[in-house]
Amino acid sequence: MAARAPQKPLLRLRGLEASGLRIDQVSVHAGEAWGILGDTGSGLDVLSAILGGELARVRSGECLLPPDLGLVSFARQQALFEKELRQDDTDFLNRPDPGTPARDFVQNADSHTELIKLLRLEHVLDRGYRYLSSGESRKISILQELSKGLRVLVLEHPFDGLDQASCQELDQQLHLLHQKGLTLILLCSDPADLPSWCTHLALVRDGALRHSGPAGAIRPLLAESGDRTQALFQARVEDMRNKDGQTAPADASEPLVELHNGFARYGEVEVFKGLDLIIHPGDHTLITGPNGCGKSTLVQLISGDHPLCYSNDLTVFGHRRGSGETIWEIKRHLGIVSNDLHRNHRVGGSALAIVLSGLYDSIGLYHKPAAEERLLAERWLAWLGLSNKAARPFRRLSYGEQRLVLLGRGLIKKPRLLLLDEPTQGLDSANRKALLDFLERAAAEQLCTILYISHRLDEQRPFFRQHLQFSPNAAARPFRLTPSGLSV
């Protein structure tokens, strides 16, 4: 009886060198589910671009990719967002242009009702893309690829930006699709995000793909490797405390933020209403809730980046919004890191320039910085572990490195109020822990007041003094604020 010929791989990378990443050999066969782990800045984003066929300069080697391969990545989401901005007809319509309906990104949407319901997207399919939250737009990108009937699907950081329920449901759905024959490759920065049902695992570290093979043999090696991971983020509270910022010391008797009966909407779509929130100096506030409930919109109201900030009964740093104050009187006391800020950084500029721009509250650097300002920005890049990438264009950094640069931008001026909207998205577990440890020390020493949005249970640290929870059932109980005793 003749021996069976070995199964040909669907995908093979061998002897590759591209953008600082070396791949000796990895082969993916039909029906396998790969989990590939990589630290922030390790080259995981380069691997994503290779798998998506988006990297033009591959120096050598073999790159066998199937034609029916789909990719969901931060870079593709950014490209789609920028395309939507270019097509914005608001000025011609004399009304806000919501953008392409989400439904149009899904092939034969009516035949994917079960998946749409599972991802909880029924209510957003007819909404314009520009009116989607970051989590909703990520779900649409996943649905878009799943609706194509592909043989291979690559997901970069598949669970980042999704609420807890959506993470669990996506994990279950991907497992089911794998059992039905879909070949999966999941690129993750946190070992906790690697599904238990992965058949194969690999590690990207120090510019090379290592330790690839069956999950049972590789998982112990990943755990051992994770124990040795060093965070890039090395900022210390002492560094921030000893540097003079641009902001004035806080008056503990005056609320930083005071919102009464707050509301928000996009077009005709109501996001939330009836929200009361007061943040005094030291009232470090955690905000949680499902995708699309209005968490990021609340941050935009406070920062002045949502037009309805002038229609609300909202006071920020003692300024009643709409009373004649300038937005710069608000911005000068704020440090911001958010998905909205991240995707709107479309201008050219180096990592150093982006950090410096935090001193001027601008997207892009349009001032010649003083020597001491430049020195301070260089110090922040050193504390972020990115000194060697100071001159690199912001968009040529990995997504996680971009996030670290934006953290430096938000912290450089020692703000009175730090608005952090999912700041650890794209970061590995070591950098996530380092940032949270830093914030805990900053809170303890009263260097600033922190408002923090997160979907992750492991980010709910004890330094938060109040917890604003947005409910998935807004009609029954839209918000809950604890432990202050206030509720809505």
Which functions belong to the PLM regions below?
Residues 11, 19-23, 257, 271-274:
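Conserved structural motif at the start of ABC-family nucleotide-binding domains
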Residues 38, 44-110, 300-363:
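ABC ATPase nucleotide-binding domain signature region
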Residues 110-125, 356, 371-389:
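Conserved ABC ATPase "signature" region
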Residues 128-133, 368-369, 393-397, 401:
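Conserved ABC ATPase signature
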Residues 141-142, 407:
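Hydrophobic anchor residue at the start of the ABC signature
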Residues 153-157, 418-422:
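Catalytic Walker B motif of ABC-type/P-loop ATPase nucleotide-binding domains
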Residues 208-236, 461-462, 470-488:
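Conserved beta-strand-loop-alpha-helix hinge in the C-terminal portion
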